[in-house]
Amino acid sequence: MEDSNMLPQFIHGILSTSHSLFPRSIQELDEGATTPYDYDDGEPCHKTSVKQIGAWILPPLYSLVFIFGFVGNMLVIIILISCKKLKSMTDIYLFNLAISDLLFLLTLPFWAHYAANEWVFGNIMCKLFTGLYHIGYFGGIFFIILLTIDRYLAIVHAVFALKARTVTFGVITSVVTWVVAVFASLPGIIFTKSEQEDDQHTCGPYFPTIWKNFQTIMRNILSLILPLLVMVICYSGILHTLFRCRNEKKRHRAVRLIFAIMIVYFLFWTPYNIVLFLTTFQEFLGMSNCVVDMHLDQAMQVTETLGMTHCCVNPIIYAFVGEKFRRYLSIFFRKHIAKNLCKQCPVFYRETADRVSSTFTPSTGEQEVSVGL
């Protein structure tokens, strides 16, 4: 008789839990959220220590992520615009990926302040930064998927890619991707608001039960299942094609890149997904007690922060692995940064000019930079 009730309990465990993309310190508080008296012993579950740890750790971590991520993604945008001129579909996707990361990063200083204090920016700013956070988050995932498909077409279906991989098609798919990212973010924006609780203002989502369930399922599908399926399918085809390629150097270079993409992605996001899984099935797995809940709160803060640092790695993985791109970056610093720091070095600038003219041509430069992804 007990076994017959397992499936309904399992389904209920899936649909009765929701998780925010925000840190646990600003987790959603709705009618279905855990209260201090929800546990069997009737004793309150005080999470003061969890909040204190978050107040100490999250602000400096978010600040570092913001600084390194902002600088890295701005460099990607500058190089793509000034050197590459956005002449290929890969460039378009790289540009939009950097924009997604920047939208995501722009909210981090405010979440850093909120982790250490109350929310002081009002309801409108609460919705605005929530929207930027979600749009940047989903946009980043979607453009990683597009970049993966772009590499798949370029390597596995090279003839078809000559017609399909155009700048126009890249712009169209990018616009559609942004629209989808906005729609995916709407539930979080609509149901997020600033409230006053216990003499402090908070900013977080207040989902009705139905929308909470929908948001949880949609987020798991779009941010975990879909990208994993695309990566497995596309990179399996890419590896199969590359292992038949006679160009050993090109093959090994592409394999190293694919290996780096997959390893870094799983390294930064697998811990968060594991903690998210445990939290989702917390009641079903018999872990619904205060001690476990506090440990999961702490783990969620740490692993989600680790996942957010992935936006700092994107410029390295998707741009700077190309040798020509690194040379573009070196020349950019020599030509623009060093020019302001050392105006009395004519020999230095002649060397830079020679490198620019001899190393890069419109034909080879554009082709080699795209090899980075």
Swiss-Prot record:
Q: Origin organism of this chain?
A: Rattus norvegicus (Rat)
Its PTM note reads: N-glycosylated.
Question: Disulfide connectivity?
Answer: 126-203
- Annotated keywords: Cell membrane, Disulfide bond, G-protein coupled receptor, Glycoprotein, Inflammatory response, Membrane, Phosphoprotein, Receptor, Transducer, Transmembrane, Transmembrane helix
In Swiss-Prot or TrEMBL terms, this protein is called C-C chemokine receptor type 2
Query: Which Pfam families did the record assign?
Result: 7tm_1
Transmembrane portions of the chain: 61-81, 92-112, 129-149, 171-191, 221-241, 257-277, 302-322
Where Phosphotyrosine occurs, the residues are: 152
